[in-house]
């Protein structure tokens, strides 16, 4: 995989260089000023359709997919998941860290369980691959 916040670079790789390598459009927030890419636009139906023309998946910030959990513990999933799925895009959110858990989880395994089991992501970006692999091996249905 090649992942980038820069949509122009990913378009160049796919359309000009004709790469067959899997490409992931990373999604940030415009206020972060990571590139000239308009992330607000890319998160729309029209924007995600455009992403599907040059990328195989998206890499959203985890908070762009889940904003928290409700009183029963069910994830509050944003429309971004559905929009990406409607455009046949893989979803690999970032960055899952043992030492920086969101307020709605109390452990790394709980965070992984929420995203893999309830949200249904295809993969993740993590700084703790050993723990992610252990989780996946223990929770694999194969």
Predicted regions located by residue number:
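Catalytic cores of phosphodiester-bond hydrolases, prominently lipid phosphodiesterases
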Residues: 1-142
């Amino acid at each position: 995989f090649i992942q980038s916040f820069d949509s122009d670079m990913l378009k160049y790789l796919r359309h000009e260089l004709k790469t067959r390598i899997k490409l992931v459009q990373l999604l940030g927030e415009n206020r972060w000023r990571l590139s000239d890419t308009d992330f607000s636009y890319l998160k729309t139906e029209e924007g995600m359709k455009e992403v599907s023309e040059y990328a195989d998946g998206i890499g959203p910030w985890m908070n762009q997919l889940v904003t928290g959990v409700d009183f029963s513990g069910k994830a509050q999933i944003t429309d971004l998941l559905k929009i990406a799925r409607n455009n046949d895009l893989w979803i690999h959110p970032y960055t899952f860290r043992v030492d920086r858990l969101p307020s709605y989880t109390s452990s790394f395994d709980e965070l992984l369980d929420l995203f893999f089991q309830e949200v249904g992501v295809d993969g993740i970006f993590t700084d703790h691959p050993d723990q992610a692999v252990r989780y996946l091996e223990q929770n694999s249905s194969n």
